[in-house]
Amino acid sequence: MSFNGSKCKREPRLKKFQELTALHSLIGEDQLAELLDISTKTLRKWIKDENIPKEMILGARLEQIFESIAKPKTSEHSSFHFIDLFAGIGGIRRGFESIGGECVFTSEWDKYSQKTYRANYKDNHPIVGDITKVNTDLIPDHDLLLAGFPCQPFSLAGVSKKNSLGKSHGFECDTQGTLFFDVERIIEAKQPKAFLLENVKNLTSHDKGRTFKVIKQS
């Protein structure tokens, strides 16, 4: 039987590096560096060099961060659990917390909105960035899904601007218009008791009502 010692040594390091880059993609550089108690400069160097220190390989810190996303600690006193998608700075969340809800997962891609959100809410779970990259296994079970998905592809002003620029709108806008289908993907996988989708008035009449019909049928 042959034994490749160097390969065995590489495998744990590779696994940890893959975990590190996955978290970097999920929650961003600033949050990850803060959670690891290192500078963003150090984090960039680890990723650039594809190398992380021995103590990180032997420790469980990366697994703990994944755990805080998928299974955050919750209060015994909350009436229900909800997730906050396309969260902005947390305006919708405020109302549902006021009636006893507890937020167990947050997604917001804009780093400036993230910064304000984190100042508004001291959570035990990090904010996930691009929801399109999130496997539903990483989303905790919840009773209610909140999603204020982008309105620009559907609003009167947004559609008018895109038309003037010769750009697609509605579901044809592949940067923002298709994000509803990520909401659908999560609802299908997690089966919350209820969901609330917030958008503009024109959503119901966009594309002669066909857009809203697709949403209702989904």
Regions found by a protein language model. Give the residues of each.
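Conserved active-site and SAM-binding loop architecture
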Residues: 1-218
